[in-house]
Amino acid sequence: MKIKNDFKLREICGEYVVTAEGMQAVDFTKLISLNETAAFLWKTAEKQGEFTVASLAQALCDEYYVVMAQAEKDCEAIVAQWQKEGLV
């Protein structure tokens, strides 16, 4: 998977939000807010270019004190949400 180029993570007033740029922004009627951990995963996905749930889960385990099974479950949930919103 890959994050679509039209979406960018921004920190606005201490909050992480995903914003649309270019033509996608015309129909973008809501901001997508991310917590700190989700923002970390977004940044990791951007760095990786092509990413998988497994690669994000490994990065989560490397950065935070979390077991792989929980990291995979959490990453599956956030990636599913990103897919639902059309971000990846």
How would you label these PLM feature ranges?
Residues 1-40:
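Acidic, low-complexity/disordered tracts enriched in E/D and polar residues
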Residues 30-88:
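Long, charge-rich, low-complexity alpha-helical segments
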